[in-house]
Amino acid sequence: MFRQLSQDVQGFWRFVTEASEDVYDSPAARERLAAKMVGRWRSGAPLTLFPDDPDGAARDDFGYEEQDADGTRCPFSSHLRRSNPRDSLEGGPEQSTKVTNRHRLLRRGRPYGPPLSEAFDVDEMLDADDDTERGLHFVCLCADIARQFEFTQQTWIENQKFSGLYDDPDPLMGSPQDEDTTFTIPDDPVRRRVTNMQRFVEVRGGAYFFMPSRPALRFLGRAALSG
C-alpha cells in the first residue's frame, strides 16, 4: 500500500505554538504539546519511557499497561498510541496484545520536499516562506489490507471515541475541518484539553499493489521458462 501524504509543517507548529500557551505554563510548552500529540519527542523517544527527557533514545520495545495505563505520559488520543495500542486495549494486557498483533503492519516512510528549516528550528520554520509542498511517501506491507491497514485507519486512527474518548480524532490526520474537535491530555489533578483541532496531513494520492511472495515468483518464473 502506498500513500503520498502532504504535511502542513508550518501550520502544525503555528497551531502548537498558540495552543500550548493555554495548556502548559513553561518555556518548553510548545515541544511538550507537540510530543503529546505525536506520542514521541522529536528525537524519537517515546513519552511512555521518557516522559520528561526530549533527548531519550528512540525505542519501540515497550507497552503501556505497566507504566502508562492512565495515559498521563502518552495520551490515549496521540497518533502513536492510536496506530499501535499495544497492550492498552480492553480485556487486559495479554488479550490486548493478541488483538493488536492481528492488525500490525510493516511500514516505512520517506520525506519529500525541502525542509522549512535546515536546522529544524521551530522559529525559523514559522518565519519561512512556505510555498513548496512537502510531506511523506508512506509505504506499508500487509498480508491482509482490510484486516491490517484499513482496520487501523478506520477503527483506531479515525475513531473519535477511541479508547473511551468522546470527540477526539487523531491529532495529526483525523480531524474534519468542519467539526469542533478536541485533543484530551490526561493529567493530575485534572485533564487538559486542546480545542479547535485542525488537520495537518492530507492524502494526495495512493494505491494498493500486489507483491508476490518469493515462492510465488519462483513458480511464475518456472512457468515462464517451461511455457
Question: PLM features: residue spans?
Answer:
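Long, histidine/aromatic-enriched segments associated with O2/redox biology
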Residues: 1-227
